[in-house]
Amino acid sequence: IGPNGAGKTTAFNMLTGVYRPTDGGIRLDGQNLIGKKPHEICKLGVARTFQNIRLFSQLSVLDNVKTGLHNQITYSFAESMFHLGSYRKKEKQMDEKAMELLRVFNLDGVADYKAANLPYGKQRKLEIARALATNPKLLLLDEPAAGMNPNETEELMETIEIVRKRFG
């Protein structure tokens, strides 16, 4: 929380490996994050949303959340190509986990809709659900209410409180 131009997004970009600080260090649970790639930092437990919504607009709501779960995949490329081994079981588990998150955000009823077809406020909630799917230790919300009307903002605040209580 801070005024425009205070450097919030720049700080988020440094925390998530988009920018590299010129001096100092960034640690999470004693591990240095400097020099790590964004996907490596995500695996270490840092997730974020953006000022401008960045969803996969042509994917379903469910599939958008599942993209956040892919850092936890344990099956091989061959298993995924040919639906062998643990692929079906793991995909079913990902579907269940994604639906659980969608229920938290009251998006389970639109799981099969394209993300692009959701109202703006629901797209924001979907972006947060996808970030939570990575199972983060630290969740960074960059201007989460930007562009929302007062009703959407109030609903988002209530949802964030539910997330705080449920996911700590």
Model-derived features with residue positions:
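Glycine-rich phosphate-binding loops of nucleotide-dependent enzymes
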Residues: I1-G168
